[in-house]
Amino acid sequence: MEIWYLGHSSFRIRSRKEIIITDPYGPEIGFKLPKIKADIVTISHEHPNHNRSNLVAGRPFVIHAPGEYEIKNISVFGIPSFHKNTIYLIEAQGIKLCHLGDLDYQLEKETLDKINSPDILFIPIDGCDTIGPKKVIKVIRQIEPKIVIPMHYRNEGLKVKEFLRALDVKATPIPKLIIKKTDLIFEGEKVVVLKRRKK
């Protein structure tokens, strides 16, 4: 599996044959979404910074509501949350990913039980309509992922530094994450910061 960060809350997740794009955004955000195509697009909520599936090529299957979906070899489970937000659990190649969308509150037990310790967690960190760097710690401890990837920030330096400082970890930004299920056999959690892909 290969994961690129496209900026804001958008990621490109490539499994063996399928490509998933999360929360494609419009130019209103201050930078452009790279030219991309996909098989599946997930939209956490209906806002131009998150729902511009029309900018994704390839005639993807667009998911913008809670529910269970099976597309090709990908399993997607959308969980409703506050702020008309959908949390997505995506399973591919035996790896379970959780995209929290615009989460801005602590999770309830029922939701935590559904999320159930994913391998990779995409979590918002900027505190603008979402949880901030300090509240992030509690949410991460609740969810117990193997890998944490921050998202939903515009200044690539400041918010990430606050986030890493709050967690008391160091992480050098990398262009992409390449991972397989056997790479996830370790204790504790790891933070991965991805550089925004501009092309």
Features from the language model and the residues they span:
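Active-site metal-binding loops of divalent metal-dependent hydrolases
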Residues: 24-26, 45-46, 81, 100-104, ...
